[in-house]
Amino acid sequence: EPSTFEDLIAMNALYRPGPMDYIPDFIDRKHGRKPIEYDIPIMEKYLKDTYGITVYQEQVMLLSRLLADFTRGESDALRKAMGKKLRDKLDHMKPKFIEGGRKNGHDPKVLEKIWTDWEKFASYAFNKSHATCYSWVAYQTAFLKANYPAEYMAATMSRNISNITEITKLMDESKATGIMTKGPDVNESYLKFSVNRKGDIRFGLSLWIHKRRSDLLRCKPCCF
């Protein structure tokens, strides 16, 4: 039950093999069934929007700088090493992270735990900018499907116009929501799927009349 756009971004980033293990905790923390906890209090600065759970590559970079004084270059190298599973590189950087964090007054055992958590999820971690783009598309399409369901389904059918199996599934889904899909009609149909004045979806003429587009234009020039 996302309540903010940030929740959509996190959902997109979490739904992959590594971070997926954290989904139950993320949900419970969001809905108040579990307390929001931070391994080190200052981590709230970058983990507040994700309820104390590291979700994005950018968070790993920012936290490595905050906790252990990594430079921008070192934090980016850490991101690359985790993303590409470069074990030798990670083993080389871990002591620097632990020691840098210790110098800043953080418990080495807690730092070990943080590093282990990062290793578990980071190989599949998504960067936030990509997750944001995908979530924006999801938000737009969800809005269209909720507010213009017939038009949305007609457009989706047109997008899958050469896949009859997918069109059949979409027709069934439309029917379940009260939207009927009707056969072609020379007075109502367009080239592809469309919606008539009654809110029904009409098959496009191009699916049934196996002629060139130019021939269809001569038959009904106003609709193509």
Predicted segment positions?
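Noncatalytic, beta-rich nucleic-acid-contacting surfaces in large DNA/RNA-processing enzymes
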Residues: E1-F224
